[in-house]
UniProtKB/Swiss-Prot annotation:
Protein's name according to its UniProt entry: Phosphomethylpyrimidine synthase
Keyword set includes Magnesium: no
Binding positions for Zn(2+) per the UniProt entry: 269, 333
InterPro entries registered for this protein in UniProt: ThiC, ThiC/Bza_core_dom, ThiC/BzaA/B
Pfam families found in the cross-reference section: ThiC_Rad_SAM
HAMAP family: ThiC (MF_00089)
Pathway where it operates: Cofactor biosynthesis; thiamine diphosphate biosynthesis
GO CC annotation terms, alphabetical: cytosol
Amino acid sequence: MNYTTQMDAAKKGIVTKEMEIVAKKENMNVKDLMELVSKGKVAIPANKNHKSLDPEGIGQGLRTKINVNLGISKDCYNIDMELEKVQKAIDMKAEAIMDLSCFGKTEEFRKRLIDMSPAIIGTVPIYDAVGFYDKELKDITSEEFLKVAEKHAENGADFLTIHVGMNRKTAATFKKNPRTMNIVSRGGSLLYAWMELNNKENPFYEGFDKLLDICEKYDVTLSLGDACRPGCIEDSTDASQIEELIALGELTKRAWERNVQVIIEGPGHMTLDEIEINMKIEKKLCHGAPFYVLGPIVTDIAPGYDHITSAIGGAIAATHGADFLCYVTPAEHLRLPNLDDMKEGIIASKIAAHAADLAKGVKGARDWDNAMAKARRDLDWERMFELSIDEEKARRYREESKAKSKDSCTMCGKMCAVRNMNRVTEGKDLNMLRDDD
């Protein structure tokens, strides 16, 4: 190859096979896509060692993508169950999967995940550090943290979430500006704790050039984590969040100079009225880099329903610039999600993503809705099921409550507006009282 990374290829005017695949999926000219990749406005996470990958693009002008989180924990250490979740995510066409495993030796699961998955795979190396070395967090050295990141890259992870922006300056801002929920990012809290316990700079910030060496070697996309994302609406858009975002913007430029692709991670919890400005701030401070948001969750009072609170926020966020939505399940804030929780979270996130694509005018987005409208007009139930975002649920609901007439459902019966308008426009009688028609 005459290039090191997708961005390097794009800057050299080389169209990669990954670019060709993404351009075809997005119905766009591959040269236009290449230009966006060269400028960092689109990322195509594609580790050289992820052989089963079916690449996707994330960023400006493309369909909004979704990510599914899964992974093993100390309380739920069941690799087979997590692999079932992987298959569920693949079957439901999630574009990305993040392995958030945080207990024990995680490499076996990570390798199996990457081997079987056509979806983009992301990981958070700091979660793995304690188990990787069997050492207490404070005893892990800066070089050892970087070695864990390299192992994940070597395994084939397409993007690594690293909370590089939690540096001493961001930490000082956090200390001066008390929060209700402090730091709720798992990786961010671990790094902050390590820095405080050792009185040292963030090892990934201090060793950022070495981290870029790793990313360039394997063509890993760097997902710059938001350690200071708000964990409740009271903490949103505060000094700590913005201080870190400024740092992420500076780090983005350094990464691009090395031809390393970047995604910026974002909030978090915030009220509806703050979402649009947060998207604009990120795009401004981080130079148009793709934005990856968790939600945002728009109210804190709905445990058990946070797939809904996040879908509301995600739709608004993606309408105003977010490119990548991390799914949230009904189990958020309560427990590890099961397969049913996963399905609910994926569907909610996909609805939010598609709704935003409609609002943004993404090419081809309306075709799906237009096809559904025509199927409904024609009372073509089979076609409606095929077009449904959750075909199984749509079929089950109709089967559970059968109408006497195939032309209607049990909501309206023969008073169905669609049925009656079709009949009248075709010159037919309505026959409201007869059961034989």
